[in-house]
Amino acid sequence: TSPAMRATALLTAEAMPGFRDWLLRQYPELAKAAGRAADKGGLNIEGVAWDPGNSTLLFGVRCPVGATGIPVLRVRLDPGAGWSVDALSEPDTLYITNHQAGQGIRDITHDPVAGGFLVLLGRSVSGDDVPFQLCRWDGVSTAVEVEAELPNRMKPEGVTVIRAEAPGRALVVGDAGSFA
């Protein structure tokens, strides 16, 4: 934990030892991809969100994406337990199926205003010519609703909700020094 975080005691940050190994044991279909470079179809998780309604962590997979759809790894976490893999249980996978070929999850965030999640979809590997889209997802179904098409030159990487009450706003940031 950094000195700044220790000083405030409002937030702590620490690694969860053994998490990667635990994750790959729970999702054996991803283990093969974990040994490859991201742009060669390797495992690339870019989005993470907390689902307060289900006490689950959602991990958005950028790559690999198969015929089943874009995987969202859902891992139940006991927030009152110690910070170790022993606090994790009941993993499962949801799939977003109404996406364009070559898309993966670039980010995912809980939307406390409208409920559900905002999901940023884009290239699963660098160089693919697929659209970047800001989507709304209910966290349960296999479908997302496209809220906005974003310019490829923006290279969107992150999204967050600004306000916790209506009207909410979303901020999207990109690699090219841009935001929307």
Please place each PLM-identified region on the residue numbering:
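Sequence/structural signature of beta-propeller domains
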Residues: 1-180
